[in-house]
């Protein structure tokens, strides 16, 4: 049983370390706003993971995969949201002026808004359900009891929270924030282009 938990932990940490919408959202929020705002986003992302992992654990992902119209709707909806996030970042990057003072800090978003953005960013990537469905199908067979199943679920949640806490803390360091202030326009533009790219990829790959 210990090997099962270690295997799932290794698979999930590799998946977490692969840069995606969640990573870029947390890092961009931490470096441009604050660690507190980024952590609220992390909590939102973690709640999103709870939803996807819970659906996979209960086997509901099989229903979604069989209902082609629902799967397409989720993919297109998620893609459009990521495109919208990318548009907002690109628009903000174009409006930024080359000033040394950290002007964006005056207009910090509400914590609830960062939480919601983190949650929606994660839920906007329906490929997560394919990932979690694969994990539970491969490693959680009929011989694995209910307690162990929910133990793996808890492991995934804790691991997600821990990883993105590290990301938020790293990108909120003063050195990182000073570097961001010098290159804010380019960093936000790059992040916006990535989000738009993720969104377009979801839509065309449905």
Curated annotation (Swiss-Prot):
The keyword Cell inner membrane is annotated on this UniProt entry: yes
Pfam family for this entry, one: LysE
Keywords recorded for this protein, A-Z: Cell inner membrane, Cell membrane, Membrane, Transmembrane, Transmembrane helix, Transport
Entry keyword annotation includes Transport: yes
GO biological process: amino acid transport; threonine transport
UniProt topological domain (Periplasmic) ranges: 22-43, 88-149
A single Gene Ontology CC term: plasma membrane
Cytoplasmic side: 65-66, 174-206
Membrane-related topology note: Multi-pass membrane protein
Disulfide bond entries: none
Transmembrane segments: 1-21, 44-64, 67-87, 150-173
Subcellular location field: Cell inner membrane
GO MF, one annotated term: amino acid transmembrane transporter activity
NCBIfam families linked to this entry: 2A76 (TIGR00949), PRK10229.1 (NF007591)
Similarity section: Belongs to the Rht family.
Its biological purpose: Conducts the efflux of threonine.
Name of this protein: Threonine efflux protein
Upper lineage: Bacteria, Pseudomonadati, Pseudomonadota, Gammaproteobacteria, Enterobacterales
